[in-house]
Amino acid sequence: EMCIRDSNGHYYKWKEGNIFYTKTGTGKPILLIHDTDSGASGEEWAKVAKKLAKNNTVYTIDLLGCGRSDKPSIQYTSYMYVQIITAFVNDVIGKPVNVAATNLSTAPVIMANALSKDLFNKIILINPVSLQQLKCIPDKSTKFKQNIINLPIIGTFIYNKLMSPIKVDLLFRNKFISRGQLISDNMKDAYYE
């Protein structure tokens, strides 16, 4: 079976790991895709999904390595996210979909659309990254830094420092939401997962 149900959603079995998603409402399908930073998850879309579900079938997805999805020890690339998005639309949604994506997830959505135009109706890009940011080419120092971060003790230490409750609170206040009262406990918990 391709999908597993849990109390809060479903799991889609993809080749590199299980991908968590939610499905609510009925009507035309809409897929909501969160940013690709390490703490991101579909929980970012909770309030929007609730409103859209009144007239649509709304899917939120936790991309591989994020939220309640598996976090395999693999190299995460934009093209991997293209493959996930394409497979998810084909296997789970099963028909053309409207998509909304934020920040770093916008590039894989654009590429998925370029490769499989028949899967997407409308695409909404929220705060997309600039082409200038996307044109960076890895060099030898990038590979060295990646190898250091991939060392279990060092990588785990850095991740734990970056995703501590204090750092996540600062991230929310500085980057995402200027009014602290809008930050739900569920959203914070999703970032800690």
Protein language model regions, located:
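Short, small-residue-biased leader/transition segments that mark boundaries at the very start
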Residues: 2-4
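Conserved hydrolase catalytic core segment
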Residues: 94-138
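Conserved alpha/beta-hydrolase catalytic His-Asp/Glu region
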Residues: 134-135, 159-193
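Conserved HGGG/HGGXW glycine-rich cap/lid loop of the alpha/beta-hydrolase fold
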Residues: 17-68
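Active-site loop/oxyanion-hole signature of alpha/beta-hydrolase fold enzymes
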Residues: 60-100
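A catalytic-pocket lid/entrance helix-loop region that shapes and gates access to the active site
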Residues: 135-154
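Short, hydrophobic alpha-helix immediately C-terminal to the catalytic nucleophile
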Residues: 46, 86, 110-114
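Conserved catalytic-core motifs of eukaryotic protein kinase domains, centered on the activation segment
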Residues: 42-44, 69-75, 134-137
